[in-house]
């Protein structure tokens, strides 16, 4: 049971990490696009 709990929280953490990573990529993409438009 303990192992299952650990795996579950581990998976959730990885999902949260992936989400924030996508969030960062989107932000960087938006900034880069704005910079190109302004240039």
From Swiss-Prot:
It comes from Spirulina sp. (strain CCAP 1475/10). Its main location: other. Belongs to the gas vesicle GvpC family. This is Gas vesicle protein C. Keywords: Gas vesicle. One of its GO terms (cellular component) is gas vesicle. Confers stability, involved in shaping gas vesicles, hollow, gas filled proteinaceous nanostructures. During planktonic growth they allow positioning of the organism at a favorable depth for light or nutrient acquisition. The gene is gvpC. It comes from the Bacteria. It is found in: Gas vesicle.
